[in-house]
Amino acid sequence: MRGGSWPSVVVRALQAVGGVLLATSVAAQEPTTPPPSIPVLPPVTVIDTAPLPAYGIPLEKYPGNVNSIGPEDLRRQNVDDVAETLYRRLGSVNITSAQSNPWQNDVTYRGFLASPLTGSPIGLSVYLDGMRFNDGFGETVSWDLIPRLAIAGIDVIPGSNPIFGLNTLGGALAIHTKNGREFPGTMLGASGGSFGRWSVEGEHGGSRGPLDWYVAFNALDDDGWRDHSPSELRQIFGTVGLQDRGTRVSLTYIYANNDLVGNALAPTSTLARDRSAVYTFPDQTRNVMHLGHLRGSHQVTDDLLLSANAFFRDYQRQTFNGDAEVNCVDDATGEVAFDASGRRLHLGRCSGSAVGFFDSAGNPLAGTLRRQAEAADRTTRTHTQDWGTTLQVSHKASILGHGNRLTAGVAYDGHLARFNQREADADFVLSGQSVGTLRTGPFETRVDVATEQHNVGVYATDTFDITDRWALTLAGRYQHVDIAIRDRSRHNPALDGDHAFSRLSPSAGLAFRALDALTLFGSYSEGFRAPTAAELTCADRNAPCNLPNAFLADPPLNPVVARTWEVGARGTLPFGKQLQWTVALFRTDLEDDILFTVTESAGGGFFRNVSQTRRQGVEAGVSGEWTRLRYFVSYAYTDATYQTSTTLASVTEADGVRVRPGDRIPGIPEHSLKVGAEVEVLNDLWVGADVIAVSGNVLRGDDANHHAKLDGYALLNLNARYEPIKHVELWTRLDNVTNARYATAGALNFNAFASPIGVERFVSPGSPIAAYAGVRVRF
């Protein structure tokens, strides 16, 4: 939103929400019939402490600020993506849409990232029904592969919880899917709206005796609001289960076939002329996944529960990118300039005489240096196979009259990946204000590499009731990782390498139920992340990689270690049907954080360790119901900073960027506020509004914080649901009602199409006002 400070845009948006809710509340004060009783979902009272089914602990004994989103919250939002669901509801969750595609969002929680883009510094682990969902090649998370309709709930588990294994630096997401015993019935739905979007969906669940079943499907097409940005999603989910006395076994299959086009950041000068324009196109990703998951649990005795699972996933990812690359060339010969050490001359030094520099063959140059844009088409294919199993035992007992819950397990997962990248010369093609590429030469294979990874973890967590008001939780996990990398092209054997990492990570926490409606808690935890195969093969500053387009023989990287402290409180107040509140303070220090530093205009760069970084902040939330009104407020402050002095390589600064302790890490906003409410205006007619307000963040590439931040923004969204007759629901959603002009991600780079070529701000523009509507029929 242009104009005004971040607080002022928040105030204006909140005033708009207040007007909507005031009007609807007045209408609700004079119903034509007595108001019906409104079903109330019970608050989450038991927290799962491990990936598989276990004896959880009551919420008042959990030493952390866990957040949960239930099935009714998911149904009321009417959004198409897991990431969007989290973003709209939780203050600590934000989106940076670097790809400008709604199904390829980067999700940050407490300043830690889960992303579908290879090379992103992943700091969150994601579990689907107890199965680790981060892929084995780059630990990425492809949100489009998770069928939203089949989701029963999401738990957001804070901190460096060692029980959830690799990448749990800032938290873990535990996603639970539906089954026919708990979600019986049939639903068919259709919807459509802005930018050519349409979708059809359906689900059916049921049970008979010990057998239950559930199936869901979704088909969606979207033209995209930016030029040349269509997407297609096809998702199928099915599960069948057997339940008899204390035993349950289920088999799940998920299929996804999605074609996503998101054309990333664009220069602000281009967007000023046409906000829907793209910098270069196409930028296409094709994801195809088959996943099978077998899981079971057996109640051996009233106090002993055994759980196990096994899974196999076949995942193929293909990309096609038209890129603009800026090189420093000799204007007399057109040859790219290299320095005496054989490195390409940095664009920041590309001026003046070419004397003293050389072409790629080592011949001296004699002309004048200038920047020149070149087009290239790049394709990649990544074929990943992931498999694994977990065995877990959970036991509850009384020790000298004190309650005790112990859960322990052993987990293994393996990964095979084959990566191939090809590149071809191309020409630029103008399409309005957008620029595409057209291939002019043959594709040549640049990389053909295979990786193999094996992860073994042993974990345990124990909660002991010191008294009826004090609970102590101790946990730990030993993790071992083996990674093997092999060159399959027979042209680059230096790629071959074997790497091993291991660590024992502990945690401890205390919860004190000071009053029946007040709990205080505090915890310390450690997490661990091993470098991925993509990172290990792209860590040489002298040989930048176009992620994931190139791999080379590189220096080793150290694993990342996270240490988190958290204190907080939560409780309830007797307001309305019950007001729930929570507040927490956290600090996570990372040792040997792994960052990707961009050194080339087309995105090339390399990974490196940074000795100390920190994410710290405050979370606060309120939610509840009052007569016909449901509401929530969720706020987060996140201070993400470097804690060491170092120089980072840069695409725009020839001497690099010098960062100092206290400099803010790019891409992480300090303030985030989510406010929402829904009121029943008439019987079975619900009208709602929500505000998303996010402060500005530092541009990528400006790690020293010398440039102006990306502007903050505030979005107002409206929604309504109505059941005209039993079993039929009509819904509508209006996003970005004020048509705010905003961006969620930004970077500094050279604009290849400027005259002369120079450094400019690139941003990912947010979607303009959009309307969607649909119908669901249940029977």
Can you say where each PLM-predicted feature lies in the sequence?
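A beta-strand signature from Gram-negative outer-membrane beta-barrel systems
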Residues: G123, F133-D135, D144-G189, R778
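Face-selective signature of the C-terminal outer-membrane beta-barrel domain
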Residues: R248-S250, N287-R488, T582-L585, E625, ...
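Periplasmic N-terminal accessory/gating domains of Gram-negative outer-membrane beta-barrel systems
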Residues: T45, K61-P116, Y127-W143, G153-N161, ...
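Gram-negative outer-membrane beta-barrel transporters
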Residues: T390-H395, L400, T467-L472, Q578-E591, ...
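Transmembrane beta-barrel wall of Gram-negative outer-membrane proteins
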Residues: G192-D221, R226-N263, P282-L305, Y459, ...
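Structural signature of Gram-negative outer-membrane beta-barrels, strongest in the C-terminal barrel
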Residues: H402-H415, V447-T588, E678-L682
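C-terminal beta-signal and adjacent terminal beta-strands/loops
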Residues: F528, A693-D702, R721-F779
